[in-house]
A protein has these predicted regions:
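A compositional/biophysical signature of low hydrophobicity enriched in polar/charged and small residues
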Residues: 1-97
């Protein structure tokens, strides 16, 4: 598919009302570049796992789509250099670590 640029984008919102959060989440659900979206505790409100074909697509997404969304005040992007582990297996009770 050519979507080799994987990024994690941490997003901080200015407003945290139920309406602001719902609006952000609804928008993110509609964005094909976003594979995962997690609501967090801590310094940032959301963590997005995103994929792009190249740096130009990433820049367009950041500057023209994500950052201009209402209430978004900060986006911190980390580019994945290599994937160390990816699994869908869940630890079962009684399994040793």
């Amino acid at each position: 598919l050519g979507l080799d640029l994987v990024c994690f984008m941490q997003v901080r919102l200015q407003a945290h009302s139920e309406k602001a959060l719902a609006r952000f989440e609804e928008t993110v659900r509609s964005l094909p570049a976003v594979l995962e979206c997690h609501y967090l505790t801590g310094e940032f409100d959301y963590l997005l796992k995103t994929v792009f074909r190249n740096r130009q697509e990433l820049e367009h997404f950041d500057r023209r789509i994500l950052s201009p969304l209402p209430h978004v005040v900060q986006v911190l992007t980390s580019v994945v250099l290599s994937e160390i582990k990816s699994t869908t297996e869940l630890p079962l009770p009684g399994d040793s670590a």
